[in-house]
């Protein structure tokens, strides 16, 4: 199979004031905000409704209901597994060319008629501003579709085997035998789409459980995939609780893989559950997960102060710090802080927090009440600690929306609680170190947290940067030099980390797709032996 279709990154729309793009998105936002959508399960292409329902709300106006989604129970899970089994019989044998045609069509739909719908749903249900929605729900997911199709073709075209005379050796890239369980997070619509679609592209079937706090954009994605031509049952859509959906799925003998993004604790529970049931499965399940992070910024004394201030504000506070890659701890030399502090605080003071409908708001609301309570507990802890000082923010209000102002903590303790634990909110903790302690500080960066997802080092001293790159080899799966630790782009920076941050299977790369295939080696012999005797058996 060959193709001349080379993927390119989707251009990011700017949505500047007065532009048609901005006006159209605002119209779609207002239209969807005025509706209350009923969201069914999708099993075998059919809408399924249940007695138990959950609500889609605006985090920035949590009394405003956007939709009611039906929740799966034991019966619906059983139906979905059976639907997946039946769909697998046909889909697993569907030629790659037909599969890529469907997902390239999905990319075209998202580039065009579905773009405003998916972006607006993301803004409304996840409280993302227009730019954050655009780079996620539109551009990144379009890139996932297009680049994954190219990578899948590259995989299938790869036949590296030697074939001696009279023999033909080949590799067959089969899908897994069974179904993949895709468990998706609230924070990225693109990841929510990619987790079931990447295995499906490789010929697998998937059961998709979206995060309950972000069902709305996921529902529109499954509708868009249907329009793109995805056959019924290839991806079954099952909103519901973790226990009612996850427990029966994870113990089913036909489970062939798990594609997960979420908390480290949940991923560890999944892994333990699979381990306890390992003798039940028809095949060993592939386990792919991207989990938590405690992402760092290490500044060298040679750093440009303006660049550092911008990286800190964007890296820590875009999308309210609810990115697995968000900067959460920073190590700043004391002599840099003297110059940085006023610039950083002045810039931070200009940051506006509010509804994404107001395009001048840089930050919006955190996702839900549980997140709000968890994040503010860390702020309260810092306020009451002799080892910490809050120098910005520290204020919050959940009366209308779950709003938390960008909060900066200075600590004298490099092992302070907010330096070690994942907060997943707009809280950045800074530890000031003496420039002479550069080497010791690299050790702190490496050893303070169990995570190893992203991190950045900033400075103009090339020798120091090279030394940090070597010393922090296993501290981050995505390592940024003179840039914030967020914003990985498909086709440019494959994303993932190790240690407590996941299996580092690099979403948006060929490496991830290889987890969803089971290779068969085929040897065809044209001159088959007819005598068992080898020459060495001859008598002297």
Residue ranges and their predicted role:
Residues 1-65:
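Hydrophobic face of amphipathic alpha-helices that form TPR/SEL1-like repeat modules
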Residues 2-4, 10-14, 61-67, 86, ...:
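Conserved C-terminal structural/oligomerization subdomain of aldehyde/semialdehyde dehydrogenase
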Residues 49-51, 57, 62-156, 442, ...:
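Glycine-rich loop-to-alpha-helix module at the N-terminal edge of alpha/beta enzyme cores
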Residues 58, 70, 134-137, 184-185, ...:
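Active-site proximal loops enriched in glycine and acidic residues that flank catalytic Cys/His/Asp
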Residues 63, 99, 122, 203, ...:
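Residue-level signal for inorganic ion chemistry
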Residues 123, 142, 152-307, 504:
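Rossmann-like NAD(P) dinucleotide-binding subdomain of oxidoreductase/dehydrogenase enzymes
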Residues 129, 165, 206-209, 294-298, ...:
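Short beta-alpha connecting loops at secondary-structure transitions
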Residues 224-229, 251-253, 257, 264-414, ...:
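ALDH superfamily catalytic-core signature
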């Amino acid at each position: 199979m060959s193709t001349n279709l080379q993927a390119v990154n989707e251009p990011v729309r700017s949505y500047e004031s007065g532009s048609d793009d901005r006006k159209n998105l605002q119209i779609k936002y207002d239209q969807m905000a005025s509706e209350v959508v009923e969201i069914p399960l999708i099993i075998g292409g059919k809408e399924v409704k249940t007695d138990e329902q959950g609500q889609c709300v605006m985090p920035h106006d949590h009394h405003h209901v956007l939709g009611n989604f039906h929740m799966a129970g034991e019966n619906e899970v059983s139906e979905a597994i059976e639907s997946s089994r039946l769909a697998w019989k046909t889909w697993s044998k569907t030629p790659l060319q037909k599969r890529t045609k469907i997902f390239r069509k999905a990319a075209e739909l998202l580039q065009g008629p579905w773009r405003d719908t998916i972006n607006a749903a993301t803004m409304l249900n996840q409280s993302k501003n227009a730019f954050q929605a655009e780079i996620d729900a539109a551009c990144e997911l379009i890139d996932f579709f297009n680049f994954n199709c190219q990578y899948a073709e590259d995989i299938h075209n790869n036949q590296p085997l030697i074939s001696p005379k009279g023999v033909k050796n080949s590799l067959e890239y089969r899908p897994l035998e069974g179904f993949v369980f895709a468990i998706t997070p609230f924070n990225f619509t693109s990841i929510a789409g990619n987790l079931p679609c990447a295995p499906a592209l490789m010929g697998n079937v998937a059961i998709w459980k979206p995060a309950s706090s972000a069902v709305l954009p996921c529902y529109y994605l499954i509708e868009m995939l249907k329009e793109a031509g995805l056959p019924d049952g290839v991806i079954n859509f099952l909103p519901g609780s973790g226990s009612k959906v996850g427990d029966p799925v994870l113990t089913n003998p036909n489970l062939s893989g798990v594609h997960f993004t979420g908390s480290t604790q949940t991923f560890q529970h999944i892994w333990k559950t699979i381990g306890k049931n390992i003798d039940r499965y028809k095949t060993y399940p592939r386990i792919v997960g991207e989990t938590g992070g405690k992402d760092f910024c290490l500044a060298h004394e040679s750093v440009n102060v303006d660049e550092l201030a911008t990286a800190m504000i964007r890296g820590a506070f875009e999308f309210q710090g609810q990115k697995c890659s968000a900067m959460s701890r920073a190590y700043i030399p004391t002599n840099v802080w003297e110059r940085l502090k006023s610039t950083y605080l002045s810039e931070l003071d200009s940051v506006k927090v509010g509804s994404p409908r107001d395009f001048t708001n840089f930050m919006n609301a955190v996702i839900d009440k549980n997140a709000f309570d968890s994040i503010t507990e860390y702020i309260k802890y810092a306020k009451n600690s002799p080892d910490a000082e809050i120098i910005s923010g520290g204020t919050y209000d959940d009366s209308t929306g779950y709003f938390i102002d960008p909060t900066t903590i200075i600590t004298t303790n490099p092992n302070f609680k907010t330096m070690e634990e994942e907060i997943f909110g707009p809280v950045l903790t800074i530890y000031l170190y003496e420039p002479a302690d550069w080497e010791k500080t690299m050790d702190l960066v490496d050893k303070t947290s169990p995570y190893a997802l992203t991190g950045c080092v900033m400075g103009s001293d090339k020798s120091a940067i090279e030394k940090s790159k070597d010393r922090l080899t296993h501290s981050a799966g995505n390592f940024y030099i003179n840039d914030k630790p967020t914003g990985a782009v498909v086709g440019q920076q494959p994303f993932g980390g190790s240690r407590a941050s996941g299996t580092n299977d690099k979403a948006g790369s060929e490496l991830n797709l290889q987890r969803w295939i089971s290779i068969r080696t085929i040897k065809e012999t044209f001159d088959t032996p007819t005598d068992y005797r080898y020459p060495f058996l001859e008598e002297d």
